[in-house]
């Protein structure tokens, strides 16, 4: 399959079927008490379609969908794979339906990548939670276990955030 055709095919599958989600997990042993966990996934009954997508991105894994083993799930959930393989290739695709969601997802993934080896500021985590909930609001079927207010109360904000341009 030629590259232009392949990219159009993958873009169509992503626009129609992909999930760009960010789970928010309470984890008491973390300083900010919350973990922000981005995941890219596609569910299909055809492994062939998912293998084309997996080979295009060069990362992720295929597995039976839990609770619906007749379906196959393509998942990319390692931060390094999301940042180094998935995001650069998604940047090149002509997404239409998922474009806005992808831009939000990209910002969350790249922020997490930049923070990986630094002391995490809880206010940055708080901002990522807000962006994650905004991303969820783009999908009418999206359901969150906890309200945004409940999550925000859990996160200690240890540093006042200065508005841009003020010093």
Curated annotation (Swiss-Prot):
Keywords in alphabetical order: Endonuclease, Hydrolase, Intron homing, Nuclease
Stretches that traverse the bilayer: none
A Pfam family per the record: LAGLIDADG_1
BP term (GO), one: intron homing
The protein's enzyme class: hydrolase
Intrachain disulfide bonds: none
EC number, UniProt record: 3.1.-.-
InterPro entries: Homing_endonucl (IPR027434), LAGLIDADG_dom (IPR004860), LAGLIDADG_Endonuclease (IPR051289)
UniProt entry tagged with the keyword Ribosomal protein: no
GO MF annotation list: endonuclease activity
Domain of life: Archaea
Family note: Belongs to the LAGLIDADG endonuclease family.
Role played: Endonuclease involved in rRNA intron I-gamma homing.
Record-given protein name: Homing endonuclease I-ApeII
């Amino acid at each position: 399959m030629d590259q232009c055709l392949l990219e159009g095919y993958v873009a169509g599958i992503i626009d129609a079927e992909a999930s760009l989600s960010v789970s928010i997990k309470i984890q008491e042993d973390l300083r900010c008490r919350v973990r922000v966990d981005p995941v890219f996934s596609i569910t299909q009954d055809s492994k062939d379609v998912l293998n084309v997508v997996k080979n295009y991105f060069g990362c992720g894994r295929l597995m039976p969908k839990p609770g619906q083993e007749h379906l196959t799930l393509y998942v990319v959930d390692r931060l390094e794979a999301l940042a180094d393989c998935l995001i650069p290739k998604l940047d090149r695709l002509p997404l239409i339906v998922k474009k806005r969601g992808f831009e939000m997802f990209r910002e969350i993934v790249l922020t997490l990548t930049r923070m990986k080896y630094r002391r995490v500021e809880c206010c940055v985590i708080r901002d990522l939670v807000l962006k994650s909930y905004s991303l969820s609001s783009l999908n009418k079927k999206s359901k969150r276990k906890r309200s945004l207010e409940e999550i925000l109360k859990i996160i200690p904000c240890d540093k006042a955030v200065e508005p841009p341009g003020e010093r």
